[in-house]
Amino acid sequence: MSQARFIAFSDGSALVNPGGPGGTGFVVLDRARPAYRFGGTRWVEDGPNAVTNNRMELRAVLEALEGLPGGEQVEVISDSRYVVDALSRWIHGWRKKGWRTASGEPVLNRDLIEALDARASALTVRYTWVRGHDGHAVNEVVDQLAQAAARGVAGPGEAEVVAALRAEAFLAGGSAAPRSSRA
């Protein structure tokens, strides 16, 4: 699915883990147009759950998948092994075991994992892991978006997002700017 119509990069951050505040960051590229959107959210609390890095990572994927048209192929790229493994490998066993881990404990973050599973059921999603802080320009931008959201400050803007997408050849260079929206 390397030619998925949508590529979604996501990252999450908790300044104090657990406890927060936390933030999410994402960039979604629509290869068919080309167009993209990006953004992030600051989380001071997360309902009855503590703000954690893993919850922010999962929430970032949810935000990235929000609004994508059903039936489309999406590649989600994350530097979180937890996200990639939870959503592509472990989820199948957890469902069979009544949302229990191999050791019999309740699955942490079940609410978000089930929400992502429901959203992904309308799409064809592939989860891909990349090493964080290893020269992946778009991954660095989503990390900066998540960190900025957690701190409650402005993060990278459109110029930085476009530069990162071009650096990794997701967008061609040239004078015509692709359509964008900041979430």
Swiss-Prot record:
Pfam families on file: RNase_H
Keywords: Cytoplasm, Endonuclease, Hydrolase, Magnesium, Metal-binding, Nuclease
Classification via InterPro entries: RNase_H, RNaseH-like_sf, RNaseH_domain, RNaseH_sf, RNaseHI
Binding site for Mg(2+) 1: D11, E57, D79
Keyword Hydrolase set for record: yes
Free-text cofactor note: Binds 1 Mg(2+) ion per subunit. May bind a second metal ion at a regulatory site, or after substrate binding.
Name of the protein in its database record: Ribonuclease H
